[in-house]
Regions:
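The catalytic Nudix box helix
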Residues: 49-50, 66-99
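A glycine-rich, hydrophobic loop/mini-helix early in the fold
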Residues: 36-68
């Protein structure tokens, strides 16, 4: 049986409140937030690793994205992005160049889902044999140029682009 996962609850200033919530419980009070991370992985050849969501996902099946997910209770943002990238792609980016870039905040009071997103970018050398996709999450990958990512975003097929576009700029 899988252990239940919990997220820390933050206030509007991104300070821990000392409270937690069940992962994906979507019943947050106004002014409560959880923390998520996205890891933009740049190959030394200048292209970006993007993955395609499985068609069985309830939200945005078949869309392209960068690795990411929720920060577990007691976990740091950096530890979470390293974990998510490893779980979803098999890559250990802990020794890659780069790190934290910026954060943004989303307020969704109708859905009772308010959150912060910490954006990281890591640059390193890796080969196809280093990639081991998480089958329940991803249905393919590619190394894409910024122009290819922009084109996918223009088609509505690349998630979060408007919020993270600065992570693809040098």
């Amino acid at each position: 049986m899988k252990k239940e996962e919990y997220w820390d609850i933050y206030d509007e200033n991104k300070e821990l409140t000392g409270r937690t919530m069940k992962r994906n419980d979507w019943n947050m009070r106004p002014g409560d937030y959880h923390l998520t991370v996205l890891g933009v992985i740049r190959h030394t050849n200048g292209r970006y690793l993007i993955t395609k969501r499985v068609m069985t996902k309830s939200w945005a099946p078949g869309s392209w994205e960068v690795s990411g997910g929720g920060v577990m209770a007691g976990e740091t943002s950096r530890a979470a992005v390293l974990r998510e990238v490893r779980e979803e792609t098999g890559l250990d980016v802990s020794d890659f160049a780069g790190g934290y870039l910026f954060s943004y905040r989303r307020d969704n009071p109708e859905e009772k889902d308010n959150y912060f997103v910490d954006i990281y970018r890591f640059t390193g050398d890796f080969s196809e044999s280093d990639l081991h996709l998480q089958e329940a999450e991803t249905d393919g990958w590619k190394l894409a140029s910024v122009d290819e990512i922009r084109a996918l975003a223009a088609e509505g097929m690349f998630l979060h682009y408007d919020s993270i576009r600065d992570a693809f700029e040098e």
